[in-house]
Curated annotation (Swiss-Prot):
Organism the protein comes from: Corynebacterium aurimucosum (strain ATCC 700975 / DSM 44827 / CIP 107346 / CN-1)
Residue ranges of the region described as Domain I: 1-63
Gene: ruvA
Protein name per the record: Holliday junction branch migration complex subunit RuvA
GO MF, one example: four-way junction helicase activity
Role summary: The RuvA-RuvB-RuvC complex processes Holliday junction (HJ) DNA during genetic recombination and DNA repair, while the RuvA-RuvB complex plays an important role in the rescue of blocked DNA replication forks via replication fork reversal (RFR). RuvA specifically binds to HJ cruciform DNA, conferring on it an open structure. The RuvB hexamer acts as an ATP-dependent pump, pulling dsDNA into and through the RuvAB complex. HJ branch migration allows RuvC to scan DNA until it finds its consensus sequence, where it cleaves and resolves the cruciform DNA.
Amino acid sequence: MIASLRGTVLDIQLDHAVLECAGVGYKVLATPAMLGTLQRGEEARVMTTLVVKEDSMTLYGFTSQDDRDMFHVLQTVSGLGPKLALAALSVMSAGDLAQAIAGEEAARLQKIPGVGKRVAQRLILELKDKVKAFAPAESADLSSAAPAAAGPVVEDVVEALIGLGFTDKMARPVVESVVAEQPDAATPVVLRAALSQLGAKK
């Protein structure tokens, strides 16, 4: 398993970054919070896990060991794959997820895109005892992320939310509202804020 990568950040997109290590570019899928810590042209070290399927090999990147461990724990739930596990960590940290699961906060878990009442109940039932080891995580400081132009940000974030299962009609007003309140916010910051608001409306 590829447990970590250290190299130069070549590219940063809405859902992934490309790190060049020893002349090889690795595409790493990650949460908005993790992507917000990277800067093009600078060296970075990213904790990773490799998910191997019959037709693909995908790298996922994390800001902390807890997030990576939670990524694996979430996938022990029947019917929950890496895409949904990453979506969960895009909305809440490992510590916050652990609190919600241990506290049987089904409504809070339903803020995660793709998680309805039944999946939330399965998370609680199957993981309540497994998440006790996760300490509450401090809120990530997203204010240091580089600013981006508001126009492209709206379109990019709406596109990312549609990819997560939201409709344009649901996503666009929320994204535009977030950008209006935080006109200098970077794309990962806007995406995370929009995810939180959309989850609260479910």
